[in-house]
Regions:
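Short, Lys/Arg-enriched N-terminal segments with co-localized hydrophobic residues
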Residues: 8-32
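Gram-negative bacterial Sec-dependent N-terminal signal peptides
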Residues: 32-52
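Intrinsically disordered, low-complexity segments enriched in small/polar residues
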Residues: 5, 16, 27, 51-52, ...
């Protein structure tokens, strides 16, 4: 079906694509570079004693050496936050709970990858997750609900960036805690980027799905109930934003995008998503799950035109 090959998408990094950027965004980028320089000096200072033969007992955890931390801006506090959490909710720093990866600079602003991975041994089950791109016309990328079979959350997808922006993840745990992490990404023009395929072809193939069982053992390890496994779900859909023009004209394409997605296995929920057009064209989700021995995985999606897309994928049953 011509889908992108599976891999660790978070390695993508290249030059900034040609697109409109406001002076405010350039100012943000310059501020970020200053912060990066200060961070580099701080890390260097901490490592000097060890290099000079002094004590090396103190080492920064990997996630303390962030290359693209969020930058200050009014949009989250003044506009977006109220749509994500209640005013009285205390947002805790989530760096100890989850690892969140997004590129410093994206090669393609229409397909910016991100990965959310729960840190091992935290003892907290994440039940909900909201992904936000602060400066997008539709900032809330998606609201996810996770079933117990998702275990320690490990999920990847791709999003659009309209201008340079923070991307942040807010998660809720089973015990009632709310945590947030975020990164700043240099990418712009993704919400108005040209549709990659012929419109007639895009509409004709809309709703087609593919599920990859990511068995990295090459089939050498048989399935077993209780095992942690990985899969990649790919769905054909143009995810029209309403900001894209028909090729060769100034006529805008009407918005149309997937707004709900539900994945189940043997009748048990893996994850459910309510989303918007900030998700990239032809959505792709790589996720880990706990095998419950079921022989099938079901996917159901709906879009803003009321279309329903459903498919059942056979699985090798667990032992």
């Amino acid at each position: 079906m011509g889908y992108p090959s599976q891999g660790h998408l978070t390695t993508i990094s290249s030059t900034f694509p040609c697109s409109f950027v406001t002076k405010r965004q350039l100012k943000k980028g310059n501020a970020m570079m200053k912060r990066l320089a200060l961070s580099a000096l701080a890390v260097a200072a901490l490592t000097v004693p060890a290099l000079a033969g002094g004590s090396s007992a103190f080492t920064l955890p990997p996630y303390a050496q962030l290359q693209n931390p969020m930058i200050d801006g009014p949009t989250w506090d003044e506009v977006v936050r109220a749509d994500v959490v209640e005013d009285d909710v205390f947002l805790q720093d989530g760096e100890d709970l989850i690892s969140f990866d997004a590129p410093i600079t994206a090669f393609d602003a229409a397909t910016v990858p991100f990965t959310v991975s729960q840190r091992a041994g935290m003892g907290e089950r994440i039940t909900k997750m909201t992904v936000i791109v602060d400066e997008n016309p539709m900032p809330i990328v998606g609201e996810f609900e996770f079933g117990p079979l998702m275990g320690d959350i490990d999920i990847e997808s791709r999003v659009r960036f309209d201008v340079f922006s923070n991307i942040r993840v807010v998660v809720e745990t089973e015990t009632g805690g709310t945590y947030m992490v975020g990164r700043f990404v240099e990418a712009a023009g993704g919400c108005s980027a040209t549709v990659t395929r012929d419109l007639d072809v895009a509409l004709a193939t809309m709703g087609k799905m593919k599920l990859k069982d990511l068995d990295f053992s090459g089939g050498a390890t048989p399935r077993a109930s209780g095992d942690v496994r990985q899969a990649q779900l790919m769905i054909r859909h143009p995810m029209f934003t309403g900001m894209q023009a028909h090729k060769g004209t100034l006529n805008m394409i009407d918005p149309r995008f997937i707004e709900t997605l539900e994945v189940t296995m043997g009748g048990e929920l893996l994850f459910k998503m309510t989303g918007g057009f900030s998700i990239s064209e032809d959505p792709s989700f790589r996720f880990s799950y706990i095998d419950n021995g079921s022989q099938e995985m079901k996917v159901r999606a709906t879009d803003t035109d009321g279309a329903v897309f459903e498919q059942t994928f056979p699985l090798n049953p667990g032992a």
